[in-house]
């Protein structure tokens, strides 16, 4: 009897109001479940202006309403959202006004995938803050790759799917597998080493691929070491991890995210039909460009032709211009002659009014007198000059060396034509010239005393 809660409440003999029933039920629940941990998934999350948080905690079979009051909500560090798996600590209670059974929570912690998702969001926020997800870092994929490296597990359907796509779409592309574990404790270190090795091989692009799986299975692609290894690759890289709904940190860091490994292969495998279609499009664009260019050049040529007149036309215009200039020159010359003639007439009129007849007659008489005296004066001057010249000639003849030579003397000249005035200027055997009044003699010095020089004629 003691353990019968209904008997303790007196429900076997007492009729209660609804309020009394709800109150007693609340007290009973709070007494039996003073504190409990419950695990489930968040849904129907609501945040009114009061600061309280209301949500539903559910699993696959049941659900319970929860209330997290403001003072406790402020202590919850992780961001709450629908779908997050959590562990909630609190006490079971009942809202008497509606009779709703609920959990009054005081602590909310991530549970299972929830903890992983919180770690995912924390790392995502950190790397985004460093700029590793920035679009400026994203490199374009090569349009026509020749060598592609595949960082993935050597077993499984992933590598076969990738090879199948390339064989069908671009068999000319060389594929190289860089093997690595994609799950387990060693996966992170192996993926980092495989990425570093592949980046040194000179591939045109890399594919980081893994098939689908749970969040725990794919977690190695959410590790910071793998994310930084992807970011450090100098080779453009496509991340293809899991199924289309799976998103990993490596997807954000890579240059391109593909929803599946096969989709990654299609991104890098140029389809022959697509290439032909692209070439056809380029050919059409080229033809249109050429037509437009030809049309522009034709219009430009026509414009130049309109501006460039025929040489004959230019000659006719120049001839017409020359005729016009000739006529203008003639008219100007005639006007100039008329002006000059008019001025000359005026000058003649003025000259006739001031004719110097008497002055000219006197000047003419004076001129005639001077003309008569000029020949006589000229003869007198010429006679005086001739007499003076004859006197000078006589004086010159007296002092002339030629006159001395005429009296039997001679002038001795050395080889340089210099006159010999002293015997000391000669040497025995020296040849000299003796200039006479008539002709010259070649002589040789026999001796050169200060006494008269002895000369001998050369044979």
Swiss-Prot record:
Entry's Gene Ontology cellular component terms: cytoplasm; exodeoxyribonuclease VII complex
Major subcellular location class: cytoplasm
EC top class named in words: hydrolase
Subcellular location as annotated: Cytoplasm
Top-level taxon: Bacteria
GO molecular function: exodeoxyribonuclease VII activity; nucleic acid binding
Catalytic reaction list: Exonucleolytic cleavage in either 5'- to 3'- or 3'- to 5'-direction to yield nucleoside 5'-phosphates
InterPro entries: Exonuc_VII_L, Exonuc_VII_lsu_C, OB-fold_nuc-bd_dom
A Pfam family of this chain: tRNA_anti_2
Keyword field: Cytoplasm, Exonuclease, Hydrolase, Nuclease
Assigned EC number: 3.1.11.6
GO biological process: DNA catabolic process
Known role: Bidirectionally degrades single-stranded DNA into large acid-insoluble oligonucleotides, which are then degraded further into small acid-soluble oligonucleotides.
NCBIfam families hit by this protein: xseA
Quaternary organization: Heterooligomer composed of large and small subunits.
Family annotation (PANTHER family): EXODEOXYRIBONUCLEASE 7 LARGE SUBUNIT
Annotated family: Belongs to the XseA family.
Name this protein carries in UniProt: Exodeoxyribonuclease 7 large subunit
Organism: Pseudomonas aeruginosa (strain UCBPP-PA14)
Taxonomic path: Bacteria, Pseudomonadati, Pseudomonadota, Gammaproteobacteria, Pseudomonadales
The gene coding this protein: xseA
